[in-house]
A protein has these predicted regions:
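Generic secretory/membrane-interface signal
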Residues: 4, 20-21, 104, 365
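Short intrinsically disordered, low-complexity segments
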Residues: 7, 17-19, 169
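Asp-box/BNR beta-propeller blade signature and adjacent active/binding-site loops
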Residues: 31-429
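In a subset of proteins, long, contiguous C-terminal domains/tails are tracked
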Residues: 5, 19-21, 423, 428-429
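Bacterial N-terminal signal peptides
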Residues: 13-24
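N-terminal secretory signal peptides that target proteins for export/translocation
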Residues: 1-9
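Sec/Tat signal peptide C-region and signal peptidase I cleavage site
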Residues: 26-29
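Compositionally biased, low-complexity segments
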Residues: 8-9, 24, 161
Length: 429
C-alpha cells in the first residue's frame, strides 16, 4: 500500500514537472515571438524595385562590387553575375562569375544592367597591371573608383588593383597597380601575427579628401585562411601614383600590445570572450562628417557570431577607437553593412540578416554613431527555390537628390530568383 502510494506520488510529480516544462517552453517561444514583433518595427512607405534580373542567372553581392552617385540622380551599382545552379550548402551560382553594372538616371526608379568594357575580370585573374602616369583628379564631379582584391566572387588578385572613371562609370581606365605593388611587404603589414604569406581582400571603400588626396580602406588576411581579415587604411596625396600606410582600424591580434579590457561580450563566461582584435574585420563602409570625423562601419565575426561595429577617427584616420555596435548580422556568415548620412545629418546603416525567414534591416543614429535605434525591417518577403540557404543582402546605400535613401542589395522571392533589388524610403522620417 505504502509502495503504491509512493509510486503514485512519483508519477504525479513527473507529470506535474512535464506540464510545467511544456508550459515554460511554450511561454518562452511566445515571448521570443512577441519580442520580435515588438522590436522589429517595419519601415513605412518603403518602395521595392527590381534593379536587374535575368532568367537562369544568379545575381548578387553589391557590397563586393561598389555603388556610386555623384549627384543623387544618376546612380550606378555593381554586382556579380553567374549561372543559376542549385548547389547544396552553398550559393546557387556556378559557371563563370562576371562583374556587371546597373545604371539609373532617375534617382533609382528604373535601371538598366550591362556588362562594362575594360573592367573587372576582363584581363584575367591576375592581370598585367599598369602604372599610373598622370595623377587622378579625385575631385572630378563624375569620378568613380573600383578597388579589386581577392577572396570573393569574381575577384582573384591577391596584390590588389583598381579602375577609375571620369564619366560616372560609362567608361573605365585600368587595371592599375596600387602604388608600387608592394603593399603586402610594408613593415606595418609584415610585422604582425599574420603569416608571412598574405593577400589583400578589399572591397571598394574610399574617402576623397581633395583633388590629389584620397584615403582608401583595405583589408589583409593570411593567404586562403578565412576569418583572418583585418582592416587598415592607406593614403595617396599625389593622385593615386603612390600610397602610404596610415593606420590599422582593427589590427591583427598582438597579446603584448592589446588592451586586455577591450573585449567583446559574446558569452556569459568572460573567459570565452575574445579581444576586439581577435575578431574578423572586413568589408567596411566609411563616411566623413561635416566636423571631419571619420565613421567606419564594418563586418565582424568570431566563431558563430556575426555583427556590425562602428569605429571613429577624429584625427584624419591616424588613430581609431571603438564607437558602438551597430547591429546583429544574424546566422551563417553574417552580412556587411552599408552606411550613409541623411540631409538632416542622421546616420543610416543597413545590413542583411540570414536568420529565417530572411530580412533586410535598418538602424539609425542621431548622435554620430555613438548609439543606434532598435532595428527596423526594411524588407522580409524572402523566398528561394530550395530555401536551404538564406542568401541575401550585401547592400550598398545611396542618397537621392530629394533626400530619400536607396538601398541596393541582392534578394530572392519565389517569383523572382536571385536578382538585384532596390528599396527607396525616407530615412529622416
Amino acid at each position: 500500500m505504502k509502495t503504491n502510494l509512493i509510486i503514485r506520488l512519483k508519477i504525479s510529480s513527473i507529470a506535474c514537472f512535464m506540464i510545467l516544462f511544456f508550459f515554460c517552453i511554450q511561454n518562452s517561444i511566445a515571448q521570443t515571438r512577441s519580442a520580435k514583433e515588438i522590436n522589429y518595427q517595419r519601415v513605412e512607405n518603403a518602395e521595392h524595385i527590381v534593379v536587374y534580373q535575368e532568367e537562369d542567372k544568379f545575381l548578387g553581392w553589391p557590397a563586393n562590387n561598389g555603388a556610386w552617385s555623384a549627384d543623387g540622380v544618376n546612380m550606378l551599382v555593381g554586382f556579380t553575375r553567374g549561372d543559376y545552379e542549385l548547389i547544396i550548402d552553398n550559393h546557387n551560382i556556378g559557371g563563370n562569375q562576371e562583374s556587371w553594372l546597373a545604371r539609373s538616371s532617375d534617382m533609382g526608379q528604373t535601371w538598366e544592367g550591362f556588362n562594362p568594357d575594360n573592367y573587372v575580370g576582363d584581363f584575367g585573374k591576375e592581370p598585367e597591371l599598369k602604372t599610373l602616369v598622370n595623377p587622378i583628379d579625385f575631385s572630378h564631379p563624375q569620378f568613380a573608383m573600383r578597388v579589386v582584391g581577392t577572396s570573393y566572387h569574381g575577384s582573384f588578385d591577391a596584390r590588389g588593383h583598381f579602375f577609375f572613371s571620369y564619366d560616372a562609370g560609362k567608361t573605365w581606365n585600368g587595371p592599375y597597380r596600387l602604388g608600387d605593388n608592394t603593399i603586402r611587404e610594408w613593415p606595418e603589414l609584415k610585422n604582425t601575427s599574420l603569416s608571412s604569406e598574405t593577400e589583400l581582400t578589399p572591397r571598394t571603400d574610399y574617402v576623397v579628401k581633395g583633388k590629389d588626396e584620397c584615403i582608401v580602406f583595405m583589408s589583409v588576411r593570411t593567404k586562403s585562411e578565412f576569418g583572418t581579415d583585418r582592416l587598415f587604411s592607406m593614403r595617396t596625396v599625389d593622385g593615386g601614383k603612390t600610397f602610404k600606410f596610415v593606420s590599422w582600424v582593427i589590427p591583427p591580434y598582438d597579446e603584448e600590445k592589446a588592451d586586455p579590457s577591450a573585449k567583446i561580450k559574446l558569452y556569459e563566461d568572460e573567459a570565452l570572450n575574445p579581444h576586439a582584435d581577435q575578431s574578423r574585420a572586413v568589408m567596411s563602409k566609411t563616411i566623413i562628417l561635416e566636423n571631419g570625423k571619420l565613421i567606419s562601419a564594418m563586418r565582424r565575426r568570431y566563431n558563430e557570431h556575426n555583427w556590425v561595429d562602428a569605429y571613429v577617427s577624429e584625427d584624419d584616420g591616424n588613430t581609431w577607437t571603438f564607437l558602438s555596435e551597430v547591429g546583429d548580422a544574424g546566422a551563417g556568415n553574417g552580412n556587411p553593412p552599408a552606411l550613409n548620412i541623411t540631409d538632416k545629418g542622421r546616420l543610416v546603416a543597413i545590413f542583411g540578416n540570414r536568420v529565417e525567414p530572411g530580412t533586410m534591416m535598418v538602424v539609425y543614429s542621431d548622435d554620430e554613431g555613438s548609439s543606434w535605434s532598435n532595428p527596423q525591417i526594411l524588407r522580409d518577403d524572402y523566398g528561394s527555390e530550395d530555401m536551404e540557404t538564406i542568401d541575401l543582402g550585401y547592400p550598398q546605400l545611396l542618397k537621392r537628390k530629394d533626400g530619400k535613401m536607396v538601398a541596393l542589395y541582392y534578394w530572392s522571392t519565389k517569383e523572382s530568383l536571385h536578382h538585384i533589388a532596390a528599396t527607396i524610403w525616407d530615412g529622416d522620417n
